[in-house]
């Protein structure tokens, strides 16, 4: 900052005193300098303070930002810690839940163990009760035997005393027997008490055997019920008179064993596609159970997952019993266990035999296989029979061709009569005459066209000959010869112009006068055709018409000039006549402009000043006498091959892909010495069906296709053929033509129509007619009527058939105002 101070009176006095004496002046100057230094020091101090304040503020802002970042970091850490704590809590909860589940399972196991122990205790108590009962029964039996023995002894004592000695001896023997019996019984009781644990195991075994027997009985009962239900169903069908013909030839996808296991099984039609290979699916209908099918697929997936991978399989094993396999992906699928139904919708003989065997197994009967010795067994042979060959071959599907329904003329006539059509139109005698007149008109028009075409061709030939003479001769001419030829050409052009003018005068005289007017009034019906033909002749002989065809040809010429400018110096076999300068005469409402030729003198001047170049776009390039022209033509046609023509994909034809296969031309001399020392490499070249050398990748693809037996698809083959044909067309086409041969087609259409022009309109207008052979539209004709009323000269021209030449001064319609 600059410190501004107002000057005081004292300073003014000091300034005045400066001029009075020099010492005072010096003193004042010193004081001023000191003041200036002080003010500068103050300003510097002020600036320093400002800078310090700014630095202080910046430091404060940085500290604030650091605090904010620290706070954010702390918040993030806190949130992370919370998330970690939540995850830990969740993991703890999961562990607790798992522990609880384990405790529950333990409690359940303990309860089950307790129940099992209780059942075992009950079984032991039952066994003990049974053993005690048996011991009590044995004691009772011993007591009863002792009582009987004592009773018998008492009887013997009462009967007689004579036999006392015999009785005493008998008592001693009986007492010994009783003691022995009692000892045996006691030993048996001890053994039974010891074998109590063995009895429990015996009880468990007996229970399992009983359960198995009960399960077999239940299964046998279920199967018997199933067979009874099937028999009842068959009997009911036979009683009702219903047939199973609608199930004839149907295939059941499941085997009998799986169907019989589950009892009554519901079978449904398997989902199949309606169309196969663009035709109706005529395969056999199949029945399946959804649950059995899903279970079968699960089992197959499980078996496939169980297969071990990476195991060495000896493919060259000579064991005749071993199954030989090539690759696992080419293994044949397992045989399908299906059953076919016969014509009546029942099981076949083989299926019935299997059913009988299953019934016998269920009932427990022995299944003996009986062989019929009288039956002629099938002998296995190494060759197929005719029937087996027919089965082995894949049956071809018959293509269903659509047939057109024949028209029933009698039915159509009856319908027409019923609807009232054809009742009024009974024909007339003049139909034949009208047809003959129509054919005659068409013939006359055709002759006129052909004559005009021949005249145009003759004129073009004459002009081209003159041009050829002018173009070939000027190379080696003297000035005198050129002057003579110029005079001859001038005389020829003048004579041609006079002939044209005489022809026009004759036509105008023939088309004017009272007789011509009367003739035109009499032939008013054919005035449109006559008018068109006369105007057509006039335009062909005296005028030039600019059409879309001319613009199209001009565009073609410009394209070819841009594409191949180097062939301009080659002369063609046939040349077109030079274009004469034209001037616009009048413009018709249909968009065509009529142009007349100018004086021939101006044409001659222009021909002298400009050299006419031959047309290179219409005709083929001349080869000439030299070898370079022939080589160039062969190169353009594709018959001369500079390099190897590769067959394959475009990416495989790159130089980077063919390194080392084809050597470059450069550096041959330097490589000659190295190639002599090296061994010659063996190169195998394969060609495709078109004779082109295959690239290495394409050759490998072909070999792999042959090995695997799987070639490219139909669409790829068609694309490849189409690409090759396009390349062939590009090589063989003419320089002036396109691959679609549009120029050649244009010439063919002109030859058929016999006209030197073509109308390239997209659609046929009301006043035009289309040629049925070429499809091109002809020149437009004047439509006789329109929506606007005809007045004045236009009305007279229409009814009298006269075409007046418009004069610039005589115009009925006023000129249009220009748009602002």
Curated annotation (Swiss-Prot):
Disruption phenotype: Dwarf plants with variable number of cotyledons, short petioles in leaves and impaired flowering. Defects in venation pattern in leaves. Residues 525-543 have a biased composition (Low complexity). Transmembrane segments: none annotated. Residues 58-120, 171-235, 433-510 form a coiled coil. GO terms for cellular component: nucleolus; nucleus. Residues 1-156, 210-219, 426-445, 582-591, 607-617, 665-678, 792-807 have a biased composition (Basic and acidic residues). It holds the Pfam family SART-1. One of its GO terms (biological process) is leaf vascular tissue pattern formation. Its main location: nucleus. The modification Phosphoserine is found at residue 22. The keyword Membrane does not apply. It is found in: Nucleus. Residues 596-606 have a biased composition (Acidic residues). Residues 733-744, 767-776 have a biased composition (Polar residues). Keywords: Coiled coil, Developmental protein, Nucleus, Phosphoprotein. Residues 1-177, 210-248, 420-445, 523-544, 564-617, 657-678, 729-748, 762-820 are annotated as: Disordered. Plays a role in root, shoot and flower development. Probably required for normal root and shoot meristem organization and maintenance and the proper expression of PIN and PLT genes. Involved in leaf vasculature patterning. Belongs to the SNU66/SART1 family. This is SART-1 family protein DOT2. It comes from Arabidopsis thaliana.
């Amino acid at each position: 900052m600059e410190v501004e101070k107002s000057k005081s009176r004292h300073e003014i006095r000091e300034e005045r005193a400066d001029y009075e004496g020099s010492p005072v002046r010096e003193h004042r100057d010193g004081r001023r300098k000191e003041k200036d230094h002080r003010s500068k020091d103050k300003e510097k101090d002020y600036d320093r303070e400002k800078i310090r304040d700014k630095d202080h503020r910046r430091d404060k802002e940085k500290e604030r930002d650091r605090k904010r970042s620290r706070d954010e970091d702390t918040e993030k850490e806190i949130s992370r810690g919370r998330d970690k704590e939540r995850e830990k809590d969740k993991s703890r909860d999961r562990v607790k839940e798992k522990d609880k589940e384990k405790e529950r399972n333990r409690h359940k196991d303990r309860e089950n163990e307790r129940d099992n122990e209780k059942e075992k205790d009950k079984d032991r108590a039952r066994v003990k009760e049974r053993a005690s009962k048996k011991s009590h029964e044995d004691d009772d039996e011993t007591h009863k035997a002792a009582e009987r023995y004592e009773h018998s002894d008492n009887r013997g004592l009462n009967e007689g005393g004579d036999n006392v000695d015999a009785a005493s001896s008998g008592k001693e023997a009986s007492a010994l027997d009783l003691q022995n019996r009692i000892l045996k019984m006691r030993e048996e009781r001890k053994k039974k008490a010891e074998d109590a644990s063995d009895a429990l195991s015996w009880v468990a075994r007996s229970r399992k055997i009983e359960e198995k027997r009960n399960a077999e009985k239940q299964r046998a009962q279920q199967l018997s019920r199933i067979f009874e239900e099937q028999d009842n169903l068959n009997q009911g069908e036979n009683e009702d008179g219903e047939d199973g013909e609608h199930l004839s030839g149907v295939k059941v996808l499941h085997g009998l064993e799986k169907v019989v296991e589950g009892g009554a099984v519901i079978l449904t039609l398997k989902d199949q596609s309606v169309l196969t290979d663009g035709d109706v699916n005529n395969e056999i209908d199949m029945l399946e159970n959804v649950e059995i099918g899903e279970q079968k697929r699960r089992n197959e997936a499980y078996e496939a997952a169980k297969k071990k991978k990476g195991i060495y399989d000896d493919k060259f094993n000579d064991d005749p019993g071993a199954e030989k396999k090539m690759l696992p992906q080419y293994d044949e699928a397992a045989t399908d266990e299906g059953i076919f139904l016969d014509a009546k919708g029942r099981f076949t003989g083989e299926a019935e035999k299997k059913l009988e065997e299953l019934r016998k197994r269920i009932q427990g009967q022995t299944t003996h296989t009986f062989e019929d010795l009288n039956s002629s067994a099938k002998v296995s042979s190494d060759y197929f029979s005719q029937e087996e060959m027919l089965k082995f071959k894949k049956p071809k599907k018959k293509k269903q061709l659509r047939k057109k329904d024949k028209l029933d003329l009698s039915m159509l006539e009856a319908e027409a009569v019923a609807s009232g059509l054809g009742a009024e139109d009974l024909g007339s005698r003049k139909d034949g005459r009208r047809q003959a007149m129509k054919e005659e008109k068409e013939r006359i028009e055709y002759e006129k066209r052909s004559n005009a075409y021949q005249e145009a061709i003759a004129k073009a030939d004459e002009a081209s000959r003159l041009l050829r003479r002018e173009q070939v001769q000027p190379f080696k001419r003297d000035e005198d010869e050129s002057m003579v030829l110029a005079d001859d050409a001038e005389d020829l052009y003048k004579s041609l112009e006079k002939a044209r003018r005489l022809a026009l005068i004759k036509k105008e005289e023939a088309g004017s006068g009272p007789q011509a007017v009367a003739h035109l009034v009499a032939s008013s019906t054919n005035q449109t055709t006559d008018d068109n033909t006369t105007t057509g002749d006039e335009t062909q002989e005296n005028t030039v018409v600019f059409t879309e065809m001319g613009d199209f040809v001009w565009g073609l010429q410009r394209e070819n000039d841009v594409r191949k400018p180097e062939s301009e110096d080659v002369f063609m076999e046939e040349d077109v006549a030079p274009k004469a300068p034209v001037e616009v005469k009048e413009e018709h409402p249909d968009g065509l402009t009529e142009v007349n030729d100018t004086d021939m003198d101006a044409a001659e001047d222009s021909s002298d000043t400009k050299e006419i170049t031959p047309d290179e776009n219409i005709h083929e390039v001349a080869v000439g006498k030299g070898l370079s022209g022939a080589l160039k033509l062969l190169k353009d046609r594709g018959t001369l091959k500079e390099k190897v023509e590769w067959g394959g994909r475009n990416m495989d034809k790159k130089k980077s892909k063919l390194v080392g296969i084809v050597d470059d031309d450069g550096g041959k001399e330097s490589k000659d010495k190295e190639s002599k020392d090296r061994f010659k490499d063996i190169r195998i070249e394969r060609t495709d069906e078109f004779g082109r050398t295959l690239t290495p990748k394409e050759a490998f693809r072909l070999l792999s296709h042959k090995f695997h037996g799987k070639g490219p698809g139909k669409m790829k083959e068609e694309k490849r053929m189409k690409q090759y044909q396009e390349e062939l067309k590009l090589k063989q086409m003419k320089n002036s033509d396109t691959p679609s041969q549009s120029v050649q087609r244009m010439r063919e259409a002109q030859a058929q129509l016999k006209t030197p022009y073509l109308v390239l309109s997209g659609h046929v207008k009301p006043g035009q007619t289309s040629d049925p052979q070429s499809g091109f539209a002809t020149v437009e004709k004047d439509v006789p009527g329109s929506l606007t009323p005809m007045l004045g000269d236009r009305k007279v021209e229409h009814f009298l058939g006269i075409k007046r030449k418009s004069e610039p001064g005589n115009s009925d319609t006023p000129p249009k105002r220009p748009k602002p």
